[in-house]
């Protein structure tokens, strides 16, 4: 799908932003480029659509040399999402989504159908198509930015820190949605980020760069288990190496399959009764098809008990969730580092299937850390033994 052959970018003064880069990226693969500031990751991405042109070497897309392509046509054939989102403020959401199809002279009917089809992919109502960007939240705007990159059915999408400006909860939700969307559509994604957690969560393979060169190009698991050198170890952070058992990889393997839930039409009194019976302070709210809709907690009930009568009156719809095939290490990061008490687990249709709590992770993290300490102790004992036996061997000689 995408191939770099000995690509170098040299700026005036002789500084090499990218130096002799060679790699192959397969069709449908999600590849993250990461490294410290000035490592060449953004320059590498911008050479793909010729916003920056290479000084030496060749880049091929589907075996075609991009330097032989018309740069305007090339860019229209590649999706591009940036951190600033870049929606046109004077255009409706519909007009923003079909901007590239319009440039490609699609029929009006085809453009309208494409806009309706795409808005459904990110669970936004169709009436949003007639709104303007300022009427949407930051997370909703970024969803539209992603849709615009998909609108002309581009197979290759470039993404330059697209979620970097969002708050942590919105960012987590969008990452989860986008990874699921990428799996469903089979697009090839080149994703630049400075966040190792984001790269580990999203990527099929990660390119770690330093000083314009590739230090390691491998799967997240392989990088975590076998970092190429001390730079990679320091960059990814040693704490990530012990946050989960290697043999427990997906949320579904450790989740509680009986989360306490309630439907939105129930009364607050019914909700309080369930909380007392189950000894919980939070209830997940689902519809009749068990699709996750939000949550309520005792604090909300207490604050609204004089005015609200039903669960629907106080439901908090902004709930973070993960899919059942989400890698466990990503969930560990969120619960332990970002302060989540629990995370609901859903299937591909967003039906509630389980819940992961801090308590359910205790054994996993304990075993990981304890195992690491045991290994370290064994190594120290072996070294001590070798030092003890070494002089004895000399005495025998």
Swiss-Prot record:
<keyword id="KW-0547">Nucleotide-binding</keyword>
<dbReference type="InterPro" id="IPR000644">
    <property type="entry name" value="CBS_dom"/>
</dbReference>
<comment type="similarity">
    <text>Belongs to the ABC transporter superfamily.</text>
</comment>
<feature type="binding site">
    <location>
        <begin position="35"/>
        <end position="42"/>
    </location>
    <ligand>
        <name>ATP</name>
    </ligand>
</feature>
<dbReference type="GO" id="GO:0031460">
    <property type="term" value="P:glycine betaine transport"/>
</dbReference>
<dbReference type="InterPro" id="IPR005892">
    <property type="entry name" value="Gly-betaine_transp_ATP-bd"/>
</dbReference>
<keyword id="KW-0813">Transport</keyword>
<feature type="domain" description="CBS 1">
    <location>
        <begin position="255"/>
        <end position="311"/>
    </location>
</feature>
<keyword id="KW-0129">CBS domain</keyword>
<comment type="function">
    <text>Part of the ABC transporter complex OpuCABCD involved in carnitine uptake. Probably responsible for energy coupling to the transport system. Involved, with BetL and GbuABC, in osmoprotection and cryoprotection of Listeria.</text>
</comment>
<keyword id="KW-0067">ATP-binding</keyword>
<dbReference type="Pfam" id="PF00571">
    <property type="entry name" value="CBS"/>
</dbReference>
<dbReference type="GO" id="GO:0016887">
    <property type="term" value="F:ATP hydrolysis activity"/>
</dbReference>
<feature type="domain" description="ABC transporter">
    <location>
        <begin position="2"/>
        <end position="236"/>
    </location>
</feature>
<feature type="compositionally biased region" description="Basic and acidic residues">
    <location>
        <begin position="384"/>
        <end position="397"/>
    </location>
</feature>
<protein>
    <recommendedName>
        <fullName>Carnitine transport ATP-binding protein OpuCA</fullName>
        <ecNumber>7.6.2.9</ecNumber>
    </recommendedName>
</protein>
<keyword id="KW-1278">Translocase</keyword>
<dbReference type="GO" id="GO:0015418">
    <property type="term" value="F:ABC-type quaternary ammonium compound transporting activity"/>
</dbReference>
<feature type="domain" description="CBS 2">
    <location>
        <begin position="315"/>
        <end position="373"/>
    </location>
</feature>
<dbReference type="InterPro" id="IPR003593">
    <property type="entry name" value="AAA+_ATPase"/>
</dbReference>
<dbReference type="InterPro" id="IPR017871">
    <property type="entry name" value="ABC_transporter-like_CS"/>
</dbReference>
<dbReference type="InterPro" id="IPR027417">
    <property type="entry name" value="P-loop_NTPase"/>
</dbReference>
<comment type="subunit">
    <text>The complex is composed of two ATP-binding proteins (OpuCA), two transmembrane proteins (OpuCB and OpuCD) and a solute-binding protein (OpuCC).</text>
</comment>
<dbReference type="Pfam" id="PF00005">
    <property type="entry name" value="ABC_tran"/>
</dbReference>
<keyword id="KW-0346">Stress response</keyword>
<feature type="region of interest" description="Disordered">
    <location>
        <begin position="377"/>
        <end position="397"/>
    </location>
</feature>
<dbReference type="GO" id="GO:0005524">
    <property type="term" value="F:ATP binding"/>
</dbReference>
<dbReference type="InterPro" id="IPR046342">
    <property type="entry name" value="CBS_dom_sf"/>
</dbReference>
<keyword id="KW-0677">Repeat</keyword>
<dbReference type="InterPro" id="IPR003439">
    <property type="entry name" value="ABC_transporter-like_ATP-bd"/>
</dbReference>
<dbReference type="GO" id="GO:0016020">
    <property type="term" value="C:membrane"/>
</dbReference>
């Amino acid at each position: 799908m995408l191939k770099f052959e000995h690509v170098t970018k040299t700026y005036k003064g002789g500084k090499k932003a990218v130096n002799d880069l060679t790699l192959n990226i397969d069709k449908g693969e999600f590849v993250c480029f990461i490294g410290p500031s000035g490592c060449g990751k953004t320059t590498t991405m911008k050479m793909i659509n010729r916003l920056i042109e290479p000084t030496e070497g060749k880049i091929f897309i589907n075996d075609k040399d991009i330097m032989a392509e018309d740069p305007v046509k090339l860019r229209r054939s590649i999706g591009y999402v940036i951190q600033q989102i870049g929606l046109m403020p004077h255009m409706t959401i519909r007009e923003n989504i079909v901007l590239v199809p319009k440039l490609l002279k699609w029929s009006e009917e085809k453009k309208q159908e494409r806009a309706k089809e795409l808005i459904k992919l990110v669970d936004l109502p169709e009436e949003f198509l007639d709104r303007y960007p300022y009427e949407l939240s930051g997370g909703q705007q970024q969803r539209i930015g992603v849709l615009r990159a998909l609108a002309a059915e581009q197979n290759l999408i470039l993404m330059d820190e697209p979620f970097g400006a969002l708050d942590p909860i919105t960012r987590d939700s969008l990452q989860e949605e986008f990874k699921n969307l990428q799996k469903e559509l089979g697009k090839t994604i080149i994703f630049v980020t400075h966040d190792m957690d984001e790269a580990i969560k999203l990527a099929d393979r990660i390119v770690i760069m330093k000083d314009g060169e590739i230090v390691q190009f491998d799967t997240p698991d392989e990088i975590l288990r076998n970092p190429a050198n001390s730079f990679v170890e320091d960059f990814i952070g040693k704490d990530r190496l012990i946050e989960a058992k290697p043999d427990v990889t997906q949320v579904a393997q450790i989740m509680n399959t009986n989360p306490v839930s309630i439907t939105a039409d129930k009364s607050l009194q019914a909700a309080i009764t369930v909380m007392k019976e189950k000894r919980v302070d939070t209830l997940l709210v689902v519809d009749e098809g068990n699709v996750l809709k939000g949550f309520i907690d005792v604090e909300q009930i207490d604050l609204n008990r004089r005015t609200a009568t039903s669960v629907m009156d106080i439901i908090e719809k902004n709930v973070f969730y993960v899919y059942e095939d989400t890698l466990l290490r990503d969930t560990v990061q969120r619960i332990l580092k970002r302060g989540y008490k629990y995370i609901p687990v859903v299937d591909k249709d967003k039906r509630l299937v389980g819940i992961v709590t801090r308590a359910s992770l205790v054994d996993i993290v304990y075993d990981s850390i304890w195992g690491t300490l045991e290994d370290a102790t064994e190594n120290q004992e072996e070294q001590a033994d070798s030092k003890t036996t070494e002089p004895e061997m000399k005495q025998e000689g």
